[in-house]
Amino acid sequence: MKLQKPKGTADLLPAETAKWQYIEEIARGVFNDYNFKEIRTPMFESYELFSRATGETSDIVTKEMYDFEDKGGRHIALRPEGTASAVRAYIENKLYAPEVVKPVKLWYDAPMFRYERPQSGRLRQFHQFGVECLGVKNPAVDVEIIAMADTLFRQLGITGLKLALNTLGDMESRMAYRQALIDYLTPFENQLSEDSRRRLNENPLRVLDSKEAEDIAIVKNAPAILDYLNEASKAYFEEVKALLEALHIEYTIDPNMVRGLDYYNDTIFEFIVDFDGKDLTVCGGGRYDGLVEYFDGPATPAFGFGLGIERLLMIAQKQEINFIPEETLDVYIAVMGEKANLEATKLAESLREQAFKVERDFSNRKLGAQFKTAEKLGAELIITLGEDEIRTGQIKVKHNQTRKQVETTLKAVHESFAPIFEEIYADEEL
């Protein structure tokens, strides 16, 4: 049997994980600057959590969910998105309690799972940064979180992103728009795709999100939700736009954008980049004020986004952004002979305890081969350890580029390597 990874998944080897670690470090710093705290939730949850949160007519539920019955007869689903799990954790752990400071600001970095046709930027197991801000409704919250995403992109050096903005209004506005959309689409019912015909009376806003060519042509002239906003929804959206402009964050209004999930209201947004002539969404989110209450929690306004890490890496590669910091190694220990094996192990551990990054040879190879390995690993210093060095206690520490070397003792290295390290670099412009 030939063992292979499942379709739609990827192995992240060390050269790739170095990029991921770099991005994660930058993201963690940005989220921390905005006072967001990390949350970790289970990779699988009750199927009902996701089906109710994302909507029974959503593509996630009807086509993409990985779900199964476990050995206890429970209907379980692998996490297709992060917001529902964060909301469940918020309710279950009573983060709505008055003693908890509001807003509750959470972020996560986690794998998600959707059964989709694998293609560039769309895997069946993919990874997202997500942020959720719960407990306060204020246009400034919406804009702060959009600005946080913008800050992350800028710190990573990503360019060419466009911010698309829309509002779905409050419940009153959405209901008025829903009826207008049904009235518009009904005469075209027989021309719509099968999915859109099914959604027409259940959730007509979902037709706007269709990727089918026949649906796109029909909704092109559909009424816009902006024409059905009540005064409160209009005022809220105007303040969001004013705050974005105050921060000099450029945006365009996309009146047909609805996002792919049912729980949104008011502000929604996407960061989009041109990728090989097509629009690629790398980050999207919005306000979801009814979701906590929908799951029997207290009425809780909330706003958040998800950001695809694989897509971020695709864009960076396209823009020739190098996320890999130069790999260096402080010390490489070249080992000569079996008798040096024990001392090399002790020396390596001693140096690591002193906060130096160390590698050693394990294969008892010729010195030339070991020096080549040190070069490949980017080792700055080399210590050669053989029977003579062990017998006399005297060793040489050599710089791998300048060839400058310092003679010292094994005892001195064990006691404190820092002065020796500094002596090697003294008077050198390296």
UniProtKB/Swiss-Prot annotation:
It comes from the Bacteria. The keyword Ribonucleoprotein does not apply. SUPFAM superfamilies: Class II aaRS ABD-related, Class II aaRS and biotin synthetases. GO terms for cellular component: cytoplasm. GO terms for molecular function: ATP binding; catalytic activity, acting on a protein; histidine-tRNA ligase activity; transferase activity. It catalyses: tRNA(His) + L-histidine + ATP = L-histidyl-tRNA(His) + AMP + diphosphate + H(+). Transmembrane segments: none annotated. One of its GO terms (biological process) is histidyl-tRNA aminoacylation. Its EC number is 6.1.1.21. Keywords: Aminoacyl-tRNA synthetase, ATP-binding, Cytoplasm, Ligase, Nucleotide-binding, Protein biosynthesis. It is an enzyme of class 6 (ligase). It is found in: Cytoplasm. Belongs to the class-II aminoacyl-tRNA synthetase family. Homodimer. This is Histidine--tRNA ligase. It comes from Lactococcus lactis subsp. lactis (strain IL1403).
